[in-house]
Curated annotation (Swiss-Prot):
InterPro entries with a match to the protein in the record: Peptidase_A8
UniProt function note: This protein specifically catalyzes the removal of signal peptides from prolipoproteins.
Chief location of this protein within or outside the cell: membrane
Protein name: Lipoprotein signal peptidase
Length: 169
């Protein structure tokens, strides 16, 4: 017997859709207004820099022959499906966990779109201190990291606290 979607964690998928919209809109804006590798300083430690990443986080496997595009696409699809199954099995009241899953799904789908359409992930957020630059990233990466941190945080919450949170207390 199936459950009504609104009673499951899938109710929170609107957050994944929001992440995808904001992510793809920001990337489109950067691609429209910047040349590849163009950098515009905004404040002393933050630039907008249009970059393409053919690998994963920190350009992992970026120097390979192209197979990594499909590998990372498969991972994004697999993780998104797995998290949607977990959301379906959870209740809508499990807000923290479902929001975390939705953030990860939205980020994964935003970067998946880039891989399939552009052949690489579009990055543009560039933090730096003097000549040391943190790897350039995007809104999708940020959503994935926040979602993963929330999953870890949720793991530290006691069952009694989870029950209270889910009741809205």
């Amino acid at each position: 017997m199936s459950k009504p979607i609104c009673s499951t964690g899938l109710r929170w998928l609107w957050l994944a859709v929001l992440v995808v919209i904001v992510d793809l809109s920001s990337k489109q804006w950067v691609m429209t207004h910047f040349a590849l590798y163009e950098s515009v300083p905004l404040i002393p430690f933050f630039n907008l820099t249009y970059a393409q990443n053919f690998g994963a986080a920190f350009s992992f496997l970026a120097d390979k022959s192209g197979w990594q595009r499909w590998f990372f696409a498969g991972i994004a699809i697999g993780i998104s499906v797995l998290l949607m199954v977990l959301m379906y099995r959870s209740t809508a009241k499990q807000r923290l966990l479902n929001c975390a899953y939705a953030l990860i799904i939205g980020g994964a789908l935003g970067n998946l779109f880039d891989r399939m359409v552009h052949g690489a992930v579009i990055d543009f957020i560039d933090f730096h201190v003097n000549n040391w630059h943190f790897p350039t990233f995007n809104i999708a990466d940020t959503a994935i990291c926040i979602g993963a941190a929330l999953v870890i945080f949720e793991g530290f919450i006691s069952p009694a606290e989870k029950t209270a949170m889910n009741k809205g207390e």
